[in-house]
């Protein structure tokens, strides 16, 4: 049997982990079960990734990369700032509707990581990366269209992600396209207004 290098085995194990946990949940994602899913020895998982936490981190990175790649591909080349953001958000929402299992797995992994001290660093890194990627997309759209951002792109990105995560959870829990659309439209409108300095921020009294 031909030798398979760790570099070659890595994407295979990530896919096996995603397939298994999408089907059976994060709790089922032991290194033994993931190895069995791929048909390799359990030691192969540890040799390739070191720890289960490292594998989980790689799964989160892969799921995020796949979603971001799909969204970036939808960016229009000659549209205005609002139209560009709308197209990007529409593409991301399409992944929620068409690939709910991927978003559910990301949510489950995030909640699992909150309860697992050894995964907290991976979770923080994941959210930082998602925020940075979102901020970059906002920045690129603004620069291409000559739109001056009223707030830092990272602030706009965090606001958008907070709203989108909530809409995603609603859709996963109670799918209703008709009921969900106004919320999505309101989120995009608010993001555009925030980016353009047309959304007044109220003062929150300290507690």
Language model features: what each stretch is:
Residues 61-66:
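Short, basic, alpha-helical segments at the C-terminal edge of helix-turn-helix-like DNA-binding modules
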Residues 9-12, 16, 20-54, 58:
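Helix-turn-helix
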Residues 16-23, 70-73, 105, 109, ...:
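Solvent-exposed, amphipathic alpha-helical segments
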Residues 24, 78, 95-99, 116, ...:
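Short coil/turn helix-boundary motifs
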Residues 120-124, 141-207:
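Hydrophobic/aromatic-rich alpha-helical bundle segments in the mid-to-C-terminal region
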């Amino acid at each position: 049997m031909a030798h398979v290098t760790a570099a070659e085995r890595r994407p295979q194990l990530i896919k096996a982990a995603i397939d298994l946990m999408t089907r059976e949940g994060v709790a089922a994602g032991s290194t033994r079960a993931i190895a069995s899913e791929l048909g390799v020895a359990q030691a192969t998982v540890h040799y390739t990734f070191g720890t289960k936490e490292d594998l989980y981190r790689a799964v989160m990175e892969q799921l995020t990369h796949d979603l971001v790649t799909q969204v970036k591909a939808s960016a229009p080349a000659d549209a205005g700032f609002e139209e560009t953001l709308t197209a990007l958000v529409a593409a991301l929402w399409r992944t929620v509707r068409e690939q709910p299992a991927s978003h559910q797995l990301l949510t489950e992994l995030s909640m699992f990581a909150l309860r697992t001290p050894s995964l907290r660093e991976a979770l923080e890194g994941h959210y930082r990366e998602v925020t940075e990627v979102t901020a970059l997309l906002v920045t690129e759209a603004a620069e291409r269209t000559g739109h001056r951002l009223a707030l830092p792109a990272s602030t706009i990105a965090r606001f958008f992600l907070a709203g989108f995560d909530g809409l995603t959870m609603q859709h996963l829990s109670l799918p209703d396209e008709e009921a969900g659309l106004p919320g999505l439209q309101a989120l995009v409108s608010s993001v555009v207004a925030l980016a353009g300095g047309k959304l007044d921020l109220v003062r929150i009294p300290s507690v």
